Amino acid sequence: MTAMSTAITRQIVLDTETTGMNQIGAHYEGHKIIEIGAVEVVNRRLTGNNFHVYLKPDRLVDPEAFGVHGIADEFLLDKPTFAEVADEFMDYIRGAELVIHNAAFDIGFMDYEFSLLKRDIPKTNTFCKVTDSLAVARKMFPGKRNSLDALCA
């Protein structure tokens, strides 16, 4: 008889949408997160403890980004700012394994937003484990399309 593990694994599957990104230099510099969506999974089961928020970026959404996510400037006018939800968001993700497709993009934006608060908040990977599902997919399916759409098909 084998012993069953009693370790609790808490994962947060997370995605962000942004006002855009830079092609040169830091991809996040001067841009903002406008949506955070996160789903909690404990021991491989959905808990229903999700985190979702739209954010007012105090800048316009680039047309290219709007073409990707369809989130309009007008829709965001009455939403909270990142600063207003930062503590709740940090409490939600703290200690979890974050599972993010193309994690460098989202983590770059998250760390940038935290840095703008001027509160000496450490990098996300110091209080969360980060797993990049794109990197995992590339290892599992080398040479294949690894977009979320392709992986879900």
Where are these regions (language model features)?
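Conserved non-catalytic scaffold segment of RNase H-like nuclease domains
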Residues: 2-127, 142-153
